[in-house]
Amino acid sequence: MIPGNRMLMVVLLCQVLLGGASHASLIPETGKKKVAEIQGHAGGRRSGQSHELLRDFEATLLQMFGLRRRPQPSKSAVIPDYMRDLYRLQSGEEEEEQIHSTGLEYPERPASRANTVRSFHHEEHLENIPGTSENSAFRFLFNLSSIPENEVISSAELRLFREQVDQGPDWERGFHRINIYEVMKPPAEVVPGHLITRLLDTRLVHHNVTRWETFDVSPAVLRWTREKQPNYGLAIEVTHLHQTRTHQGQHVRISRSLPQGSGNWAQLRPLLVTFGHDGRGHALTRRRRAKRSPKHHSQRARKKNKNCRRHSLYVDFSDVGWNDWIVAPPGYQAFYCHGDCPFPLADHLNSTNHAIVQTLVNSVNSSIPKACCVPTELSAISMLYLDEYDKVVLKNYQEMVVEGCGCR
């Protein structure tokens, strides 16, 4: 992965090429005059060269993000609420208590082994199984071809929304069972009305609750991705001991044609979620909202301090035209390191022994450069975005935020 400080330099260069008022959000006050000088010297040559360089920088950033090309999301693309909630929990924007009312539980175990979460909606035109038996059954096909070859899937879950049943005198005491199967053979190769399947997960649920149900479908998804076995989809079966066939399955949102209507179908349709790791960086670890510590130094004192320290640098994705496919965050505080490393180096400058020796030699021999002010600690950010295939991705990117600076 490209180091974080190189990424920040690329973003800064992109802003120089774009010009205009966008510098206010990305370049600190001390650098604006230099940017203006660069633009002035460039003159007429800037027009043609800037677009070519911008394409190169954009390609570098997209490669760092693991994308083959710049996403061009369609107007029909839907961001599942589940993925938005996962982002807010994982990034620390909201605590679990604030979002618990939605019924979402953070998937600690799957996320602990993954740095990428992807969501997939099913192909609607393949959902009906002809000639099914007495129970309500549907087949779903999920296209997982957008998962990169280098991403190893560790687990997968199928999320189904079910609504409270209030039909009949005994509905409060009623239960129904939801069975999830992997389809082992396509319908065309078997006797009509029968599918060759294997059971993946099952659950007995109560009628009088409206909520999302999560089922483990990892064995099927691992066969499709790791073992490269054919993907014939999943079958969902809903049964009830005391319910007629007419009403079976109507409380589980697995079809657009339900009596409840299709206005909110986009957010309530079945969702397949995969957890994977591309071998780069750490897994999705939840970040708690940091408490701000009181500032002990006045702004005037900070301006006088020219020693190595961290400075503010806000990266706004709208400045590079990426806000159409990056869902969250709209930008982030990247910070940068700048300042002197004077002799003698103070303890708070977080110096190495080599930097101390180099600074000592510089004090008597100016041909030896001073130690440099560089990032000594970097942290990750989480990004929620639409990829090239209109699939929603939550990914952890390492070395994106400067946490500490020092003389090295």
Curated annotation (Swiss-Prot):
Superkingdom is Eukaryota
Pfam family example for this protein? TGFb_propeptide
- Family the entry assigns: Belongs to the TGF-beta family.
What Gene Ontology molecular function terms does this protein carry?
Answer: BMP receptor binding; chemoattractant activity; co-receptor binding; cytokine activity; growth factor activity; heparin binding; protein serine/threonine kinase activator activity
Main location per the UniProt record? secreted
**Tissue expression:** Expressed in the lung and lower levels seen in the kidney. Present also in normal and neoplastic prostate tissues, and prostate cancer cell lines.
- The encoding gene: BMP4
Q: Which cysteines are joined by disulfide bonds?
A: 308-373, 337-405, 341-407
Purpose: Growth factor of the TGF-beta superfamily that plays essential roles in many developmental processes, including neurogenesis, vascular development, angiogenesis and osteogenesis. Acts in concert with PTHLH/PTHRP to stimulate ductal outgrowth during embryonic mammary development and to inhibit hair follicle induction. Initiates the canonical BMP signaling cascade by associating with type I receptor BMPR1A and type II receptor BMPR2. Once all three components are bound together in a complex at the cell surface, BMPR2 phosphorylates and activates BMPR1A.
Question: Phosphoserine modification sites?
Answer: 91
Q: Where in the cell is it found?
A: Secreted, Extracellular space, Extracellular matrix
| Source organism of the structure | Homo sapiens
InterPro entries listed in its UniProt record:
BMP4_TGF_beta-like, Cystine-knot_cytokine, TGF-b_C, TGF-b_propeptide, TGF-beta-rel, TGFb_CS
Protein name, per record: Bone morphogenetic protein 4
Q: Quaternary state and partners of this protein? A: Homodimer; disulfide-linked. Interacts with GREM2. Part of a complex consisting of TWSG1 and CHRD. Interacts with the serine proteases, HTRA1 and HTRA3; the interaction with either inhibits BMP4-mediated signaling. The HTRA protease activity is required for this inhibition. Interacts with SOSTDC1. Interacts with FBN1 (via N-terminal domain) and FBN2. Interacts with type I receptor BMPR1A. Interacts with type II receptor BMPR2. Interacts with FSTL1; this interaction inhibits the activation of the BMP4/Smad1/5/8 signaling pathway. Interacts with SCUBE3. Interacts with TGFBR3.
Name a GO CC annotation attached to this entry: extracellular space
For the biological process aspect of GO, one term held by this record is: prostatic bud formation
- What's the disease link here? Microphthalmia, syndromic, 6: A disease characterized by microphthalmia/anophthalmia associated with facial, genital, skeletal, neurologic and endocrine anomalies. Microphthalmia is a disorder of eye formation, ranging from small size of a single eye to complete bilateral absence of ocular tissues (anophthalmia). In many cases, microphthalmia/anophthalmia occurs in association with syndromes that include non-ocular abnormalities.
Q: What is the effect of changing residue 91 to C?
A: In OFC11; also found in renal hypodysplasia patients
